[in-house]
């Protein structure tokens, strides 16, 4: 990720945090800063974003899980 992309991600995650939406990184509660760092140093894979909703479709959490890239 370039510097601009990291800044955009940070701003987005801070908005969710301010809204009280829990953030998770690989299944554990996390912070915008930790998620940002994981994105920057990820090698041999990417982070998949998963929006967690309640029964009414309202956002109740945001999860980032590492997914390994398969070799061709």
Regions found by a protein language model. Give the residues of each.
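Acidic, low-complexity, intrinsically disordered interaction modules
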Residues: 31-56
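Short, compact, well-ordered microdomains
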Residues: 48-72
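N-terminal acidic leader/helix
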Residues: 1-28
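A generic structural micro-environment signature
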Residues: 7, 27-31, 54-57, 65
